[in-house]
Amino acid sequence: MSSEHIQNKLALLPDQPGCYLMKDRQGTIIYVGKAKILKNRVRSYFSGTHDSKTQRLVQEIVDFEYIVTSSNVEALLLEINLIKKHDPRFNIRLKDDKTYPFIKITNERHPRLIITRQVKKDKGKYFGPYPNVYAANEVKRILDRLYPLRKCSTLPNKVCLYYHLGQCLAPCVFDVEASKYKEMQDEIVTFLNGGYKTVKNDLMKKMQEAAENMEFEKAGEFRDQINAIETTMEKQKMTMNDFVDRDVFGYAIDKGWMCVQVFFIRQGKLIERDVSQFPFYNDADEDFLTFIGQFYQKANHIPPKEIYLPDDVDSEAVQAVVPDTKIIVPQRGNKKDLVKLAYKNAKIALNEKFMLLERNEERTVGAVERLGEAMGIPTPSRVEAFDNSNIHGTDPVSAMVTFLDGKPSKNDYRKYKIKTVEGPDDYATMREVIRRRYWRVLKEELPMPDLILIDGGKGQIDSAKDVLTNELGLDIPVAGLAKDDKHRTSQLLFGDPLEIVPLERNSQEFYLLQRMQDEVHRFAITFHRQLRSKTGFQSILDGIPGVGPGRKKKLLKHFGSMKKLKEASVEEIKEAGVPLNVAEEVHKHITAFNEKAKNTEQK
């Protein structure tokens, strides 16, 4: 769509709140945003200068749509729904992989107390989140001792051990009044909402009464329950003087990135935090609002009783997203300090991110650039490294790994079974692999490397260059990596005639070469072992009556390795889908093979 068309549409934008949807050449919605004034916000994308990430977004925009709303609040709610519907790739994508555990009282005739990571609208009562399963289990263990709700998912025909331990009322055998369950549930709710001190005081009274009545065993049980409450519920430092559940938000921005920190305060304690980092393309406060809206759309994030927000945030818009929660923008005191702490943590997290990025840049892109300078060639952004692997010439293989801008590109790794070389001949092997690889590159018009690295010396390098130049007509720099007597990367050989490229052994470019050599060696060795394992497996099975290619394949698939087959009984071999008589023959053959190998080792 022409630039003139976009300019015409920009001129028609209204001076009202709403949402806008950016589209690419295929008509796919790639970004959804909201604005208090559509005209100003949308026009800003097509005027002035932008940072690199916003520029990438703008370069892909060929059309846009907009939807006018009656208020900024309505725009936020609409934006959340549009993002959920279209999943635009430039929008914030909150990860769903981190889910926190909750304690749940199930909504059943005979309720249970369970730990779950899924919060559903099923009339159950949920408490949490807890920082981890261990913490949730500790609390549940106390509740199980105090309140004997059923433990079985389905009712058995007779009482279980929990009944004898006093931790179940055995509804499988006895009638339990609904009022009894309600009484226990109310006490559990009180306990989990911060009232555990009341429960603890009641237990202390019961312990004293039992001791006075000479019921020392019962008094000891009450004492253990009190200790469990103290160690589990009171071991965390209090952050607030009450027991209200709160989420505290703080965010920081830098270099086009936003970091949001959320502190989960439950029962007056800071139990966990959630950290999200992402690029933003809108105004920071607008994207922060969008984040909050999406945050509470996730099933495992139940809005608490209160949410604390930093200054300059549209609390009315947030209130529309979580209507049953009290929205607070603290101005002073402990509450303000918590918001500041969330901001401080967000700022630190962003600083760490950029420091790590700089460090990563230094060891990858920077190292590649300096490697090119040291070798006197253009920056080798794409490097393909080769290594051969064989044992006394058996099952010879070769492997190639690819590094793009100093990082492994595993989709571009390749494995080769050597077809034309008999016996251990590294030079001939290198010729075959280079020929096969770059003949295919030419045929399929694949990306050419800027540098080829050979794990070897002059002979391997000359073999590779001969095939490239004289057979394929290619002019690609080829270098060799030599190793010392401890099999560690020692020297980089390059040029005509070959010379040692002077590299500091503690430089990032030298470390990069080490990583390349180690990676291609690992890849080749792994492939060679897989091949040997498969052929070794099949050769041991050769000559066994009733075991042809099909059954060999079946046994290999079932056991996965020779080691497991050697340890298998006749019955276990039969489970692989072979007849009993064949399983007996296989077992007999392998037992004889093992004995022979054992005797050979002893000699």
From Swiss-Prot:
SUPFAM superfamilies: C-terminal UvrC-binding domain of UvrB, GIY-YIG endonuclease, RuvA domain 2-like. The keyword DNA repair applies. Its main location: cytoplasm. HAMAP family: UvrC. This is UvrABC system protein C. The keyword DNA repair applies. It comes from Listeria monocytogenes serotype 4b (strain F2365). Interacts with UvrB in an incision complex. It is found in: Cytoplasm. Pfam families: GIY-YIG, HHH_2, UVR, UvrC_RNaseH, UvrC_RNaseH_dom.
